[in-house]
From Swiss-Prot:
<feature type="compositionally biased region" description="Low complexity">
    <location>
        <begin position="507"/>
        <end position="516"/>
    </location>
</feature>
<dbReference type="GO" id="GO:0005576">
    <property type="term" value="C:extracellular region"/>
</dbReference>
<feature type="region of interest" description="Disordered">
    <location>
        <begin position="245"/>
        <end position="285"/>
    </location>
</feature>
<dbReference type="Pfam" id="PF00144">
    <property type="entry name" value="Beta-lactamase"/>
</dbReference>
<feature type="glycosylation site" description="N-linked (GlcNAc...) asparagine">
    <location>
        <position position="198"/>
    </location>
</feature>
<feature type="glycosylation site" description="N-linked (GlcNAc...) asparagine">
    <location>
        <position position="45"/>
    </location>
</feature>
<feature type="glycosylation site" description="N-linked (GlcNAc...) asparagine">
    <location>
        <position position="241"/>
    </location>
</feature>
<dbReference type="InterPro" id="IPR051478">
    <property type="entry name" value="Beta-lactamase-like_AB/R"/>
</dbReference>
<feature type="glycosylation site" description="N-linked (GlcNAc...) asparagine">
    <location>
        <position position="68"/>
    </location>
</feature>
<protein>
    <recommendedName>
        <fullName>Beta-lactamase-like protein 1</fullName>
    </recommendedName>
</protein>
<feature type="compositionally biased region" description="Acidic residues">
    <location>
        <begin position="496"/>
        <end position="506"/>
    </location>
</feature>
<dbReference type="InterPro" id="IPR001466">
    <property type="entry name" value="Beta-lactam-related"/>
</dbReference>
<feature type="compositionally biased region" description="Low complexity">
    <location>
        <begin position="245"/>
        <end position="281"/>
    </location>
</feature>
<dbReference type="InterPro" id="IPR012338">
    <property type="entry name" value="Beta-lactam/transpept-like"/>
</dbReference>
<feature type="glycosylation site" description="N-linked (GlcNAc...) asparagine">
    <location>
        <position position="335"/>
    </location>
</feature>
<keyword id="KW-0732">Signal</keyword>
<feature type="signal peptide">
    <location>
        <begin position="1"/>
        <end position="28"/>
    </location>
</feature>
């Protein structure tokens, strides 16, 4: 009988290989699955880094000249600090006498705001206020309606009126956050009317109720500022309802306490008080929303994201910004002259692009994303009151950060993907994904790009909008990544050599003594060596390298795995981990879709005497195999 495991590996590998050989009649070079060095602190005075930063400086200046940009801000972060920054030009790009730019000048970050909106969504999900990102938004905000011709087609003729069947209520949170909702691109108002009485929520919803979705949900990516404005509104509504419910519960509790003292006289009064309190809460909230229809959203972002990250120079309201600190954007008129663009608040569109910030504040935001959601001590030092933030060390779970950085849809070019809401680009030269977000609004062009495996981040801002899919971050990454990888690999090699030298110098008797002190019962690698079979013909071979004493295994094929201890404390001597010996030799498939990093469980005989312990079998990939 053929070896089942071996056959499965071989057939799948050949099939994947065949698929990868030709694409669009062009032969592809099959590269190994990329691995990345672990980020550690680097001396920023390294000559290679200084040279890289000089090249980046030159690249930015050349690109500025090519695109008529006179004012530009650039920052690069690594691990938990800004490692390079430079500003070009003046606060007022049309006035050479205005102050020079700094990384503390306010700019409108435009659609980078969407990353904050998305983070709020994940926080509410983690805190249980949203049950699932795949919940329909109608469960939380039934007020929103839009027509869906695809729903009518799928349901047949529908109702007699033909109207009720086309009202779409199936859009989800995840679809809004990943531009998969099928909604139109823009809020149905002239952008100049954002934040005015000519673009209120009632006006927007009345207009949308007469419009249609453009596409089926999840059919393709269609960028939607409307979708994110709606998402922010719904999230704010969830917070508002949660706050009102908490206030009502508190009022009810107080009234119940009063009832205990005045059972007969106060029953009616308590009921009236409950109603009055509920109404007062609603009136107060409505008053705030009437002056700013995204108040609950903006207030939440301020207290639960900006303040905990010590982003104290970021705001949705430009009236909060010192006019002498605002970097001005400019545009080219039809006659070829330049003009400063007037600033404005974004009103209902605020969650899609209304935040003003600084390069220093956005650097703190990048550091947060690059460090698994852990708030840097540098970010937190001036923050004594995190208000409603429930966890001062993490705004979200580490697993949520990983989830938020994952793609939702891969574009057909194979190099571009969209997440919630990161715009991702695969750098073929360096075999690594850039997780980016671009912003364009009111003469500001911004770009944030993260390289999570290397803990590198870039934030660039231009005070002039020009036609480009990327604001220099891809070109800069071509300079940064090779240098950082080289230095990190070099440091890793030096560390491993030092550790090996220390191990060789360590006295063997001290090791044995330490093992005795810890009362550790070690098993010799020799007892695991052998061939393991089962009745179905599956094979698992364990062998040893005599020169190193290390254990290896295979499944009767060419994939060789290193066997290592599962637990360094040796509390589980029967459990081992298997890892591909040299993952750089393989494409990604066997690394992510095979036995790599699996745990295997050996069984021993019942004799507890050390001298007579023998291995009788192993459980691997769900199968039980017995030693022959």
């Amino acid at each position: 009988m053929k070896n089942i495991l071996s056959f499965s590996f071989s057939f799948s590998f050949l099939y994947i290989l065949f698929l990868l050989l030709f694409l669009n009649n062009n032969l592809l070079i099959i590269k190994s699955c990329p691995t990345y060095p672990n980020p550690i602190k680097l001396n920023q005075n390294e000559s290679l880094l200084i040279e890289a930063y000089n090249q980046i400086d030159e690249l930015i200046q050349n690109n500025m000249k090519l695109n008529n940009v006179t004012s530009f801000i650039a920052t690069i972060v690594y691990m938990d600090e800004i490692v390079w920054s430079k500003t070009y030009g003046n606060l007022n790009p049309l006035d050479d006498k205005s102050p020079p730019l700094t990384i503390d000048n306010n700019i409108k970050i435009a659609s980078l705001t969407k990353v904050f909106t998305s983070l709020m969504m994940y926080q509410l999900r983690d805190n249980g206020k949203i049950l699932s990102l795949d919940d329909k938004i109608s469960n939380y905000f039934p007020k929103f309606k839009i027509n869906d011709i695809y729903k009518l087609k799928s349901s047949g003729s529908g109702s007699k009126s033909g109207k009720s069947d086309i009202k779409d209520n199936s859009i989800t949170f995840r679809q809004l956050a990943s531009h998969q909702s099928g909604l139109p691109r823009e809020v149905p108002c002239d952008s100049i009317t954002y934040g005015t009485k000519n673009c209120t929520e009632n006006i927007i919803f009345e207009r949308l109720s007469k419009q249609f979705t453009l596409l089926k949900q999840y059919s393709e990516v269609h960028y939607s500022n409307l979708g994110f404005a709606l998402l922010g509104k719904i999230l704010g509504e969830i917070i508002s309802n949660s706050t009102n419910n908490n206030n009502n519960n508190n009022n009810n509790n107080n009234n119940n306490n009063n009832n205990n003292n005045n059972n007969n006289n106060n029953n009616n009064n308590n009921n009236n008080n409950n109603n009055n309190n509920n109404n007062n809460n609603k009136i107060k909230t409505n008053d705030l929303i009437s002056s700013n229809e995204q108040f609950q959203y903006e207030n939440y972002i301020l207290n639960n994201i900006l303040k905990p990250l010590n982003m104290m120079n970021s705001t949705f309201n430009y009236d909060d910004i010192d006019s002498n600190n605002l970097a001005l954007g400019y545009t080219i008129l039809k006659n070829g002259t330049f003009e400063i663009v007037q600033r404005q608040n974004s009103g209902w569109n605020s969650p899609a692009g209304g935040l003003y910030s600084t390069a220093r504040d956005i650097s703190k935001f990048m550091i947060f994303w690059l460090n698994n959601g852990i708030i840097s001590n540098n970010n937190n030092k001036n923050d004594n009151n995190n208000n409603n933030n429930e966890n001062n060390d993490n705004l979200v779970k580490e697993s949520t950060i990983n989830e938020a950085l994952l793609p939702v849809s891969l574009i057909s070019d194979g190099l571009t993907a969209y997440g919630t809401p990161f715009e991702m680009w695969y750098d073929q030269q360096n075999n690594i994904w850039l997780k980016s977000k671009a912003g364009i609004a009111n003469a500001y062009r911004t770009q944030m790009a993260l390289i999570p495996p290397l803990k590198l981040g870039m934030f660039f801002s231009s005070q002039f909008v020009f036609d480009t899919p990327d604001l220099f971050t891809r070109e800069v990454s071509q300079i940064l990544i090779p240098v950082y990888e080289y230095l990190l690999n070099k440091k890793q090699e030096e560390k491993e050599e030092k550790e090996e030298e220390e191990e060789n110098q360590q006295d063997e008797s001290q090791q044995q003594q330490q093992q005795q002190q810890n009362n550790i019962k070690l098993l010799s690698n020799d007892i695991f060596i052998g061939n393991y079979l089962n009745e179905f013909g599956s094979i698992f071979n364990v062998f040893i390298d005599d020169s190193t004493g290390l254990l290896y295994c295979n499944f009767g094929n060419d994939f060789v795995y290193l066997i290592s201890d599962f637990d360094d404390s040796y509390n589980f001597p029967h459990i081992k981990r298997i890892s591909l010996l040299d993952p750089k030799k393989y494409i990604c498939w066997p690394i992510v879709d095979g036995a790599n990093e699996e745990l295997i469980y050996f069984t021993f005989n019942d004799d507890d005497s050390r001298n007579s312990i023998t291995c009788t079998g192993v459980q691997v990939l769900g199968q039980f195999l017995y030693k022959t």
